[in-house]
Amino acid sequence: MPMKPINPSQFPKPIAPYSAGAMADNVVYVSGTLALGEGGQVLHVGDAKAQTRHVLETIKTTLEAAGGGMADITFNHIFVKSWDDYKAINEVYAEYFPGDKPARYCIQCGLVKPELLVEIASIAHLSPKE
């Protein structure tokens, strides 16, 4: 089955050659998502909770554009700049996954801009359309 790009119209144009998400069959792959605004400026500098909320809202919007939602996520890839922010990131994360939790991993690493604190990429499996 061919891949269908997902680029919600309210998102700024990506600053690199990628789509916000891609769907093949009923699987949605959401690109690594950061707290970036128009023109690539970092949002919520120094605030891990606000950056995490922005990232998860962006992922939610991408999934909704594909016909799904947060409950369809089966796996999250989480990248954190510092373990000092791990607790704050998890507090916000838990708000978006109150029931069954998707599988995930979390890696500490450098991100594309020094002010960024968290990046999340997701995989979601949508129910087949009738």
UniProtKB/Swiss-Prot annotation:
Pfam family, one: Ribonuc_L-PSP
Molecular-function GO terms, alphabetical: deaminase activity
Role summary: Involved in pyrimidine catabolism. Catalyzes the deamination of 3-aminoacrylate to malonic semialdehyde, a reaction that can also occur spontaneously. RutC may facilitate the reaction and modulate the metabolic fitness, rather than catalyzing essential functions.
Protein name according to UniProt: 3-aminoacrylate deaminase RutC
Keyword Zinc: no
Species assigned in the record: Haliangium ochraceum (strain DSM 14365 / JCM 11303 / SMP-2)
Catalytic activity: (Z)-3-aminoacrylate + H2O + H(+) = 3-oxopropanoate + NH4(+)
GO cellular component annotations of the record: cytosol
InterPro entries: RutC, RutC-like_sf, YjgF/YER057c/UK114
